[in-house]
Regions:
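Short glycine-aromatic motifs
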Residues: 3, 51, 136-140
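Short, charge-rich amphipathic segments
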Residues: 21-40, 60-70, 112-119, 130-131
Length: 158
């Protein structure tokens, strides 16, 4: 697969909407999370050309993206998504597009003046699935837990 990585600011919301729609479905399926408001905000920032990040293109079509923001002296990786991320891979080495996108983001943040720390919480990815680019750059990893407590009533009072 020949994938080109380009600056996200070259694209419009209409270019990325199908990908973000797929991502919203994955958030709903995996985390019971309504990602639609976040997706709409991302698309607005893309149209305003103010969201730094990268898009992965295959045969002229966007197949993945990642973005980051600057927050004081740290860079925060806001998201990483590649079409088909709902398909679970057997090993972390089977994520070539994710790996390339993250490598570009990490390198950009490392070269950004005043940035002394990089953070990311990529919740839709299984633990360790996309860790390789971080670990290769000597990043310290802190485990996180995503916990769910069903609050729906079971029909009983009290």
């Amino acid at each position: 697969m020949s994938v080109e990585i380009l600056d996200l600011r070259h694209f419009s919301s209409s270019d990325l909407r199908p990908l973000l729609d797929e991502e919203a479905q994955l958030w709903s399926k995996l985390l019971a999370w309504d990602y639609s408001n976040s997706a709409e905000m991302i698309l607005r920032y893309i149209d305003a050309r103010i969201l730094p990040g990268y898009a992965a293109l295959e045969k002229g079509r966007i197949c993945g993206y990642s973005f980051f923001v600057y927050e004081g002296s740290k860079g925060v990786i806001g998201d990483l998504f590649v079409e088909g991320d709902g398909v679970r891979y057997a090993s972390p080495t089977e994520h070539p597009v994710e790996t390339r996108l993250l490598a570009h983001v990490i390198e950009t943040l490392q070269q950004s003046p005043g940035i002394h720390r990089i953070e990311a919480q990529l919740l839709v990815h299984p633990t360790g699935a996309v860790a390789r680019p971080f670990l290769e750059d000597g990043v310290h990893r802190s485990p996180r837990l995503f916990m769910v407590l069903p609050l729906a009533s079971d029909g009983k009072d009290g």
